[in-house]
């Protein structure tokens, strides 16, 4: 688990195209408890300077529910589910993280990149939509409901990705999650993101056969491309994506 401002040996710091683009450090953290990531991203944000590179942390969490700072605890429907609940300082309501889900934390200096919060959210959403499209899954935004939803078919309207950020001193932390191949039953114990009866789905249930690591690589490429306003080629060299801290 990284601690601010020291960098783990496994970090890959690369500058995406074009050459003038700002560098991004990608950290592959494997399976890490949620509390450890939460504490580390806040410490990183508090310690960063105007010269600190932006970072993306890619992680898989053991089962945990997280409740946003304005979230209503009543959206946890089963008090004795056996899954811990952590109250956090991001926006949004309650969600679930667990094995088989990609979680990507975006530690971004919005002022340096001249990004408004809404612009950053839109670019994150577009990166997720493009990632899912790479596996022949059509998805879309939904007005008034942050996240990404299945666009067509029998699971139309089901949520497949969640998003929630915190901005402190012009810098973001927290991020997004994409359901790849996971046990979806814990979502039945909550109103996902505060919406009663909202179906939650994963890529495997929609027929996608790609594994977690492959999808994570695709997602990171798209996120970095969109951080710099790109909409085309992958932004990270494959060798950098393949580094891990195993």
From Swiss-Prot:
Protein family according to the UniProt entry: Belongs to the LipB family.
Alphabetically ordered keywords of this record: Acyltransferase, Cytoplasm, Transferase
E.C. numbers: 2.3.1.181
Pfam families in alphabetical order: LplA-B_cat (PF21948)
Residue positions of the active site: 193
Species assigned in the record: Burkholderia pseudomallei (strain 1106a)
Gene: lipB
Miscellaneous information on this protein: In the reaction, the free carboxyl group of octanoic acid is attached via an amide linkage to the epsilon-amino group of a specific lysine residue of lipoyl domains of lipoate-dependent enzymes.
InterPro entries listed in its UniProt record: aa-tRNA-synth_II/BPL/LPL (IPR045864), BPL_LPL_catalytic (IPR004143), Octanoyltransferase (IPR000544), Octanoyltransferase_CS (IPR020605)
GO cellular component terms, A-Z: cytoplasm
Top-level taxon of the source organism: Bacteria
Biochemical pathway: Protein modification; protein lipoylation via endogenous pathway; protein N(6)-(lipoyl)lysine from octanoyl-[acyl-carrier-protein]: step 1/2
Site (Lowers pKa of active site Cys): 159
Catalytic activity: octanoyl-[ACP] + L-lysyl-[protein] = N(6)-octanoyl-L-lysyl-[protein] + holo-[ACP] + H(+)
Upper lineage: Bacteria, Pseudomonadati, Pseudomonadota, Betaproteobacteria, Burkholderiales
BPL/LPL catalytic domain sequence ranges: 50-231
Sites where the protein binds substrate: 90-97, 162-164, 175-177
Subcellular location as annotated: Cytoplasm
Protein name, UniProt field: Octanoyltransferase
Molecular functions per Gene Ontology: lipoyl(octanoyl) transferase activity
Function in brief: Catalyzes the transfer of endogenously produced octanoic acid from octanoyl-acyl-carrier-protein onto the lipoyl domains of lipoate-dependent enzymes. Lipoyl-ACP can also act as a substrate although octanoyl-ACP is likely to be the physiological substrate.
GO biological process, one term: protein modification process
Chief location: cytoplasm
């Amino acid at each position: 688990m990284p601690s601010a401002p020291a960098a783990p040996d496994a970090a890959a710091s690369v500058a995406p195209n074009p050459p003038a683009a700002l560098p991004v450090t990608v950290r592959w953290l494997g399976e890490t408890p949620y509390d450890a990531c939460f504490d580390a991203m806040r410490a990183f944000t508090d310690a960063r300077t105007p010269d600190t590179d932006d970072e993306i942390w890619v992680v898989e969490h053991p089962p945990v529910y997280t409740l946003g700072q304005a979230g209503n605890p009543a959206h946890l429907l089963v008090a004795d589910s056996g899954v811990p609940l952590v109250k956090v300082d991001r926006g949004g309501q309650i969600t679930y993280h667990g094995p088989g889900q990609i979680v990507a934390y975006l530690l971004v200096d919005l002022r340096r990149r001249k990004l408004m919060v809404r612009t950053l959210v839109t670019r994150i959403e577009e990166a997720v939509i493009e990632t899912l499209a790479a596996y022949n899954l059509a998805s879309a935004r939904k007005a008034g409901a942050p996240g990404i939803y299945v666009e067509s078919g029998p699971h139309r309207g089901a949520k497949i990705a969640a998003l929630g950020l915190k901005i402190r001193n012009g810098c973001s932390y927290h991020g997004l999650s994409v359901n790849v191949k996971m046990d979806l039953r814990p979502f039945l114990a909550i109103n996902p993101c505060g919406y009663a009866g909202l179906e939650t789905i994963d890529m495997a249930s929609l027929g996608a056969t790609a594994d977690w690591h492959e999808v994570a690589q695709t997602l990171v490429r798209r996120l970095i491309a969109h951080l710099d306003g790109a909409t085309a080629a992958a932004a990270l060299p494959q060798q950098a994506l393949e580094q891990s801290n195993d």
